[in-house]
């Protein structure tokens, strides 16, 4: 008896523990991801997201324009907000992003796939770096996250909330783009309730 090799546990018993461990790791990951996305703008890489794709495409086309980037300039801000609000069907208040170093250039009306119409507000900093805010009516559930067009292209921080689909797009470092998006989001929500 003492000279014999120890008996091995049945294969099903060792596989059960492996399966239980894998399930536990999966649950921790899912729960952690859920909790992280509840109250902040998190990161999601979802190539099927139309809102982010449309916002990035519009930004790439119009942010590069010098003379024809907007239809209505910032000097007509009240008209711009009223016009875009009426056309998109949402109350739209252009966020003041001066604290983040960006001034409103103006805005334009764009087509937006299933949503119909979207507003695009264009902002610029002192160095000429441009970001855009893309806003459309959205009936989807609340989602917050980011979407990246390509490794070296513009990135969109987007959210769907209170009937609004919004994306802030730019080629800024991720932390700065998220800070701008949070400020824009807060001001849009404040504008909705005023």
Placement of each model-derived feature along the sequence:
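Short acidic-hydrophobic surface loop/beta-edge motif
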Residues: 97, 108-111, 121-123, 148-149, ...
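A short, solvent-exposed beta-edge/loop patch
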Residues: 140-194
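Juxtamembrane extracytoplasmic segments of single-/few-pass membrane proteins
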Residues: 15-20, 28-118
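A short acidic-to-branched-hydrophobic micro-motif
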Residues: 117-138
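Membrane-interface anchoring determinants
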Residues: 2-22
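Envelope-exposed proteins and targeting segments
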Residues: 100, 117-119, 129, 155, ...
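Short phosphate-engaging motifs
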Residues: 80, 129, 176
């Amino acid at each position: 008896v003492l000279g014999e090799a120890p008996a091995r546990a049945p294969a099903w018993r060792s596989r059960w523990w492996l399966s239980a461990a894998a399930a536990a790791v999966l649950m921790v990951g899912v729960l952690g991801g859920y909790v992280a996305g509840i109250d902040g703008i998190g990161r999601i890489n979802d190539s099927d997201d139309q809102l982010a794709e449309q916002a990035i495409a519009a930004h790439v086309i119009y942010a590069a324009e010098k003379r024809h980037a907007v239809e209505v300039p910032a000097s007509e801000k009240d008209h711009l907000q009223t016009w875009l609000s009426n056309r998109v069907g949402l109350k739209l208040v252009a966020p003041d992003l001066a604290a983040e170093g960006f001034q409103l250039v103006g805005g334009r009306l764009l087509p937006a796939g299933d949503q119909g119409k979207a507003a695009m507000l264009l902002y610029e900093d002192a160095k000429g770096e441009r970001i855009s805010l893309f806003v459309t009516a959205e009936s989807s559930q609340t989602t917050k996250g980011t979407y990246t067009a390509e490794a070296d292209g513009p990135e969109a921080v987007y959210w769907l909330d209170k009937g609004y689909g919004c994306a802030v797009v730019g080629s800024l470092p991720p932390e700065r783009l998220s800070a701008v998006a949070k400020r824009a989001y807060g001001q849009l929500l404040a504008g909705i309730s005023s």
